Amino acid sequence: MKIYTKTGDKGFTSLIGGTRVAKHHIRIESYGTVDELNSYIGLICDQDIALHDKQILKQIQDRLFTIGSSLASDPEKSKMIIPDLHLTDIELLEKEMDMMNADLPELRHFILPGGSNAISFCHIARCVCRRAERITVQLAGESTVDEKVNIYLNRLSDYLFTLARKIANDNKIPENQWIPRV
């Protein structure tokens, strides 16, 4: 299978189902941003973090491929069976956050990104996740998007924030608290 097809050379690409759209179409922007997020999560996995966290992140990467496939499909034409996102996927993120938060100091200030590469990559992924969520919410206003996708992305950004705090705590790295000037 060739990687290049030359069919996108004029600025158009195909959705799953065959519909041709401009490469700047919001549906392309949505799944492209999810793909970008998945790459950053891979970067977090490459850091020296707890094995359990890596295992959860690998599950998240799998779910992001599910989301990307769903977003890359023309809801009117796709006959391909796309894996579904389940409520249990969202519940897993919530359960993991609850477990991490049980061991973290109470959050009293905003946290500035930084402290280590792993922490910073979590914050970058969190920001990309928020962007993916904004784009898919916009897409949902124009086309069919499974509502669990936006819920998952919302929880995932919270999970990534909490994971950044956990990594700081695990490595005894003080959190960079934002103390506003008055």
Spans of features found by a protein language model:
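Phosphate/pyrophosphate-binding loop motifs in nucleotide- or prenyl diphosphate-using proteins
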Residues: 1-182
